[in-house]
């Protein structure tokens, strides 16, 4: 029997979210080692068990209360929720936050020779997909009838193989579509990875641990989106220089030893500091400009 006192987190065993999910948890201070032959990894420093499962199993495990947290793509989450609602199975959860990885879109695509005008061009045609519920909802909203061809993988080859007239599949860069003689026509759903929590009541100890993981995840993501900027600036152009720093709030201004005409500026920026901005800073007399990544942030 599983130890219900330990926090159970479901993550993708393999695939596009697996590595980044593990890295996020490690960045949050969860120490664990993954054995590829085992589906459960036990944290060394916290009462946490990681369940490494298929991505389409994660929503159900969370909704059924088998695990406490899950890291999953919103596309898989939404697809499974619609399916479970249809079957009158538990389908509720708490979305704790979206994450900064796993971005993609679910799109309709057709062969290059297809004369596509709008979504009504697909009326009465056959569409191959791994996401029948999301596709069905979109087409119902548009009032378009069609037939679907359910495939678990390699959806992009369906038109060429004569299985369908069009496809509905995940797109990141569009390179796979292009390689298979297809072009994107409609985005029907935009997705990113997210952390979800079971609606089951948690013990006080587990909820404290969940809050800690969430707080640390927030700090890790803020740090990834931020840069630490240090520079020296003439006092006569100080206000202009501060105004140029993108997204900087309340920078720290410190005097320089034995130089009353210049100060040191320390700032956290939540936007990219591009080369042209650095050149403008230099033109205003700034020097020793350093832009550094931030590993962790809190508060």
UniProtKB/Swiss-Prot annotation:
Pathway: Amino-acid biosynthesis; L-histidine biosynthesis; L-histidine from 5-phospho-alpha-D-ribose 1-diphosphate: step 1/9. It is an enzyme of class 2 (transferase). GO terms for biological process: L-histidine biosynthetic process. GO terms for molecular function: ATP binding; ATP phosphoribosyltransferase activity; magnesium ion binding. GO terms for cellular component: cytoplasm. Keywords: Amino-acid biosynthesis, ATP-binding, Cytoplasm, Glycosyltransferase, Histidine biosynthesis, Magnesium, Metal-binding, Nucleotide-binding, Transferase. The keyword rRNA-binding does not apply. The keyword ATP-binding applies. It is found in: Cytoplasm. Its EC number is 2.4.2.17. Its cofactor is Mg(2+). NCBIfam families: hisG (TIGR00070), HisG_C-term (TIGR03455). HAMAP family: HisG_Long. Catalyzes the condensation of ATP and 5-phosphoribose 1-diphosphate to form N'-(5'-phosphoribosyl)-ATP (PR-ATP). Has a crucial role in the pathway because the rate of histidine biosynthesis seems to be controlled primarily by regulation of HisG enzymatic activity. This is ATP phosphoribosyltransferase.
């Amino acid at each position: 029997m599983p130890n219900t006192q330990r926090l159970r987190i479901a993550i993708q065993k393999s695939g596009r979210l697996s590595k980044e999910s593990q890295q996020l948890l490690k960045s949050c201070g969860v120490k664990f080692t993954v054995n590829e032959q085992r589906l459960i990894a036990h944290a060394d420093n916290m009462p946490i068990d990681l369940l490494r499962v298929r991505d389409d199993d994660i929503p159900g495990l969370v909704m059924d209360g088998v695990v406490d947290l899950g890291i999953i793509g919103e596309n898989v989450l939404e697809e499974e929720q619609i399916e479970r609602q249809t079957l009158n199975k538990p389908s509720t959860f708490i979305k704790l936050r979206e994450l900064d990885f796993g971005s993609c879109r679910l799109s309709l695509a057709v062969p290059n020779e297809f004369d596509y005008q709008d979504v009504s061009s697909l009326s009465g045609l056959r569409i191959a997909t791994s996401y029948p519920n999301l596709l069905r909802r979109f087409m119902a909203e548009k009032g378009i009838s069609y037939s679907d061809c359910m495939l678990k993988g390699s959806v992009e080859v369906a038109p060429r193989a004569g299985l369908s007239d069009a496809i509905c599949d995940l797109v990141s860069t569009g390179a796979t579509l292009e390689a298979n003689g297809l072009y994107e026509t409609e985005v029907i759903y935009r997705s990113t990875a997210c952390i979800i929590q079971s609606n089951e009541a948690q013990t006080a100890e587990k909820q404290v641990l969940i809050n800690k993981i969430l707080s640390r995840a927030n700090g890790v993501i803020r740090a990834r989106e931020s840069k630490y900027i240090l520079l020296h600036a003439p006092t006569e152009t100080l206000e202009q220089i501060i105004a140029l720093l993108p997204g900087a709030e309340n920078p720290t201004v410190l005097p320089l030893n034995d130089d009353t005409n210049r100060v040191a500026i320390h700032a956290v920026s939540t936007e990219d500091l591009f080369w042209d901005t650095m050149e403008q800073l230099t033109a205003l007399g700034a020097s020793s400009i350093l832009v550094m990544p931030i590993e962790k942030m809190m508060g």
